[in-house]
């Protein structure tokens, strides 16, 4: 639920952008891609270098293009959303957006953003963050999700394996979202 809500809030911060880059293709991005496609937008998915499985997943959800996060898309983007907690992606996203484009930092935390040349911001590009969502965001998303319809891909882990789940998440080995379930629930299933 959180991934969909914060993803939706991040997408709304891009305004009416038609070509949207998504950096970090995990829980939020796989939901945002479905919503954006429903809205008639094009998604350009950026993953860790060499993550062909993640890129294939993005394309299977309707992304117009998928590639490594350190490469430029085939055309300039109107906006980009960064879900990966990697500050070094901000300058890369700024290079990928056109004049007047917006880069939205949509995660709850991020490493430091490195120094960048002013020319990346010049021509009215902007960077913003998402800290919270509003009640209205939630109402809009929950009304929209069944119309899309949003289909989530999840990988479940027993609660006793929470550390392993975090390791998989950090290393980019989760397709969609990781979900922790009580161990006794798995024994009954």
Where are the model-predicted features located?
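Glycine-rich cofactor phosphate-binding loops and adjacent beta1-alpha1 units
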Residues: 14-17, 44, 52-126, 187-189
């Amino acid at each position: 639920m959180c991934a969909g809500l914060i993803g939706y809030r991040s997408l709304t911060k891009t305004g009416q952008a038609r070509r949207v880059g998504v950096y970090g293709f995990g829980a939020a991005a796989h939901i945002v891609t479905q919503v954006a496609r429903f809205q008639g937008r094009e998604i350009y998915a950026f993953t860790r270098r060499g993550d062909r499985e993640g890129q294939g997943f993005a394309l299977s959800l309707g992304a117009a293009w998928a590639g490594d996060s350190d490469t430029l898309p085939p055309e300039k983007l109107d906006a980009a959303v960064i879900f990966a907690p990697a500050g070094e992606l901000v300058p890369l996203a700024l290079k990928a957006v056109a004049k007047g484009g917006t880069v939205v930092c949509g995660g709850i935390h991020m490493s430091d953003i490195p120094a960048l040349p002013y020319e990346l911001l010049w021509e009215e590009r902007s960077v913003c963050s998402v800290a919270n969502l509003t009640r209205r965001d939630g109402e809009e998303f929950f009304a929209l999700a069944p119309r899309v319809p949003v289909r989530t891909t999840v990988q479940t882990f027993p609660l006793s394996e929470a550390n392993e789940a975090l390791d998989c998440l950090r290393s980019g080995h989760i397709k969609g979202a990781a979900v922790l379930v009580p161990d006794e629930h798995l024994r009954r299933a």
